[in-house]
Amino acid sequence: MDRMLLTRVLSSILLAFISVAVPASAAPASGSPLLFPPNPLPGIEAAASPAQSSDARLPDPRLKDAYKFNQGGWTYVHLEGTPEEVGFQHGFLLAREIEDNVHVYTVTAPHEDKRPWSFFKQAAKNVLWPHIEPEYQAELKGIVEGLHAQGSTLDLWDIIALNGDIELSNYYLPTINKKEGMPNPVAAVAPGKCSAFIATGSATKDGKIVIAHSNWSSYAEGERWTMVFDIVPASGQHILMDGLPGVITSQDDFGVNSSGLMITETTLPMAKGFDVNGIPEFERSRKAMQYATSIDEYAAIMREGNNGGYANSWLVGDRKTGEIAYLELGLHNTPLTKKKDGYFVSSNFSADPALIRDDTPGFNPNNFESSMNARHIRAEAFMKQHYGNLDTALAEAYLSDHEDSYEHKIDAGKRSLCGHEDTSPVGEKVWGNAPYDPGGAVTGKVMDSDMAARL
């Protein structure tokens, strides 16, 4: 099956807001259940409708405003209330999915990171937990309470480790290995592997913002990266984002808030450094999406307490003003560029010279054979070709593009904007990926200002 053929999924609930394009192979095939099949939970009454394959309305007062349903391979989850209530709803509604998600990491950690899951749980307790704000501590505890109400034995440190997996395994672990004089596992490096753009003004068909993002990950993770979280917190902005079961931020990242901020990112390549006294990235990215009402506010929240974990190039648009921004968030350098006319592309390359020097010293901008630079070249060519006409349809074409700019041919592989690492006979050396690595683009999402306005 050609994974690059995208299936456009438009839930009637999401229709007014977001166009979600999913690679045909990303969603589990019928008859191929996950480790913990999403069977109806105890007490759930299904209510079928054209828009909803199942609807959960539960008697517990903490769950009165919560529900979920499945559509087109996605699970739509509505959470509403105090941090404790939002967390409880999350844990209760997605208990089986969270169990399954944690299981993936407990299996892969010893192989990829050469450390048992218990190592990450201990780091979650000692390194991350002390720096998480009370609001999000309460939400995380709520997830555990919801899990326990469904009979799960997962504990708080499982959930913190799940939320912090990327920053612990790819940023914290290398610093510990260096300190202990241990070799760093090939897989324990800052990941790359996402493609995105944001455009506005004369670059787009209607002069408004268009944003697009594809999530590249292992297929073990990607099969589970199928949540759409609709969160109405007691304080802050109403937010809509994709995500993973048990994780309080998008982590993908793709979302919008009711103030009109449109947000995504791609990971900075080979980022180094981790501040154990900083605020976890998963909290900062959630807080920024929930509370920021402008690009400057968003950047300020992401910069405050920056621990260097999960260092990303953030693409942010403000629907209210039409302004877009590019925030490279390294540990030592965090340059912010804004414009009201033009575009930014992102494909896991570093742009700022000081950031390359201090934060991503392993990145070689002149290695055009690498995935990140080859995609950068193709992304720029796509923007120039379609400048002035960019809309959601062209955004989908961008995410499904298969051109290899290095070999000058159509080839669905590691160098195409829509990634197929599993078809590539040459692994991506800078990420330590072997040939035919089982990973690639697993989801694609596009949005424009008009969609964002209807949240």
Residue ranges, per PLM feature:
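Bacterial N-terminal signal peptides that target proteins for export
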Residues: 1-13
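Bacterial N-terminal signal peptides
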Residues: 11-21
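Detector for glycine-centered tight turns/loop "hinges" at secondary-structure junctions
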Residues: 15, 207, 260, 321-322
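Boundary at the C-terminal end of the N-terminal hydrophobic targeting segment
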Residues: 24-31
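C-terminus-biased signal that marks the final domain/tail of proteins
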Residues: 34-44, 48-193, 202-206, 220, ...
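Active-site rim segments in enzyme catalytic domains, especially the processed small/beta chain
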Residues: 199-295, 300, 342-349, 353, ...
